[in-house]
Swiss-Prot record:
The active site is at 116 (proton donor/acceptor). The gene is fosB. The keyword Cytoplasm applies. GO terms for cellular component: cytoplasm. This is Metallothiol transferase FosB. Its EC number is 2.5.1.-. Gene3D superfamilies: 2,3-Dihydroxybiphenyl 1,2-Dioxygenase, domain 1.
Amino acid sequence: MVNGINHMTFSVSNMDKAVSFYKHVFMEAPLVLGEKTAYFTIGGTWLALNLQPDIDRKEIRQSYTHIAFSIEESQLDAFYTRLLEAGADILPGRKRQVETEGKSIYFRDPDGHLLEVHTGTLAERLAHYEKTAPDMLVNIDEQNKK
């Protein structure tokens, strides 16, 4: 049985630049720092950076595939400021259907990986669908609503 996400790994073109970015934006120091790898914990999740300087990174910028980190709404402005200071590519927000979806900031790291900080929760999203589109809820039990 799968117990959760073990870790995420991103290939990076410049280790020093990537480490500086993640350290500044997420206010976390690396746990492991080598010439070709770095490990962080962000919100309790293990993030690994591996040096791969020769990968074509053009296509990565065309996908909505991303990782979203939870953040308190009261912390959004400070986080946005850190993104600006780090020189992040901050993207326009995705249009939300309703306020209950939470607020987000989408941004790219120096290698083009799409990241998001998001204030909403799965429980809030499920409650929204339960009220507005109950036919969309399939295989939902009380455990999933927590």
